[in-house]
């Protein structure tokens, strides 16, 4: 679809887009036209894992200039409500969010965005790393909510019973290790994804198939020599949530990252009598400056996550590749004059 190049408002910048990662939610909107209560009613531009170059600034923008390379935080509060005042703007019910109906995303040549939510990239951080700040932010927010700290033993639950692509599990491994986790164990159906988990820092991996949740929990405990204090559940699958509860040590924390059906059956009494705290996350907040600092200092390396690259003209092929579950992260290159990472 061809659209006119947008004109930035006083507090906005116009960007020439460079790199946009394909997320599972993009594929879901493409295939099903909705996620929960968010329904696509009009043509919508996808994409929310993105970076680009500033080519024009609004009259009120002073911290950015044309030529600046930036990473885009896709969630922009529309009003200063109670959630914004307490620093949890991700929970604002009126927030703008790229590629969430009815808001357009940034998988396009040119895109305008709030300047306050565009972050300048250091020279040693690539466009692709800038785009990957979005999934990395999910890991940062999840591990902060989980309370990962020095010496933590962490169980990251990936695919189980269903074969789905989960880069989010890998970024949680990266962040947990960076935050000081002593041991991280990962479960998944796929041997190739478990190998990738080892490459990014997982200490142990378990390839699961048709085990019961209790059997998965038992395998985690046997491998670690104890029950983990923290479980990060990345799928939203009922059996995985059950396994997360059974696996987590009494007094520990289970964080739910993956979103599945609205109603699931879980052993809540088992969690209650053992004081296992169950915490949710919704996107992220206040993570872009932290993520940029980690990437610039080389404390975290997200480059291995990108396994496929396509020019924007081959977007359909890129989406089909993601849908088939090939590789880890598929990156679309939106600037025809610069296809570099």
Predicted regions and their residues:
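Glycine-rich beta-strand-centered segment in the early N-terminal region that forms part
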Residues: 5-20, 35-82, 122-124
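NAD(P)H dinucleotide-binding glycine-rich loop of Rossmann-like/cofactor-binding domains
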Residues: 39, 78-157
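Residue-level marker of beta-strand positions
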Residues: 49-51, 69, 83, 110, ...
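Glycine-rich cofactor phosphate-binding loops and adjacent beta1-alpha1 units
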Residues: 146-150, 178-179, 195-277, 316, ...
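C-terminal hydrophobic helical "lid"/dimerization subdomain
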Residues: 219, 226, 242-246, 285, ...
């Amino acid at each position: 679809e061809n659209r006119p190049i947008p004109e930035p408002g006083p507090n906005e910048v116009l960007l020439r887009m460079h790199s946009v990662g394909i997320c599972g939610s993009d594929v879901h909107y493409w295939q099903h036209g909705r996620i929960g209560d968010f329904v696509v009613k009009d043509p919508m531009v996808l994409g929310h894992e993105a970076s680009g170059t500033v080519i024009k600034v609004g009259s009120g923008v002073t911290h950015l200039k044309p030529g600046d390379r930036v990473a885009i935080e896709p969630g922009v509060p529309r009003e200063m409500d109670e959630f914004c005042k307490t620093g949890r703007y991700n929970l604002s019910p009126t927030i703008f969010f790229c590629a969430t109906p009815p808001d357009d995303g940034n998988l396009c040549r040119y895109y305008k965005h709030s300047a306050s939510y565009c972050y300048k990239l250091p020279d040693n951080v690539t466009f692709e790393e800038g785009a990957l700040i979005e999934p990395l932010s999910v890991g940062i927010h999840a591990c902060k909510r989980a309370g990962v700290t020095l010496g933590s033993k962490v169980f990251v639950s990936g695919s189980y019973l269903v074969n789905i692509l989960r880069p989010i599990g890998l970024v949680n491994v990266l962040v947990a290790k960076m935050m000081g986790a002593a041991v991280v164990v990962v479960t998944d159906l796929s041997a190739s994804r478990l190998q990738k988990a080892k490459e990014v820092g997982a200490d142990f991996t378990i390839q699961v198939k048709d085990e019961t949740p209790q059997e998965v929990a038992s395998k985690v405990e046997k491998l670690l020599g104890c029950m983990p204090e923290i479980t990060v559940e990345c799928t939203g699958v009922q059996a995985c949530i059950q396994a997360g509860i059974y696996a987590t040590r009494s007094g520990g924390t289970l964080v739910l990252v993956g979103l599945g059906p609205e109603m699931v059956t879980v052993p809540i009494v088992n969690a209650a009598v053992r004081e296992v705290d169950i915490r949710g996350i919704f996107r992220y907040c206040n993570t872009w400056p932290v993520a940029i600092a980690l990437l610039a200092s080389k404390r975290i390396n997200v480059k291995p996550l990108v396994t496929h690259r396509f020019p924007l003209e081959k977007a359909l092929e890129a989406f089909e590749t993601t849908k088939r579950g090939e590789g880890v992260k598929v990156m679309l290159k939106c600037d025809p004059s610069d296809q570099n990472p």
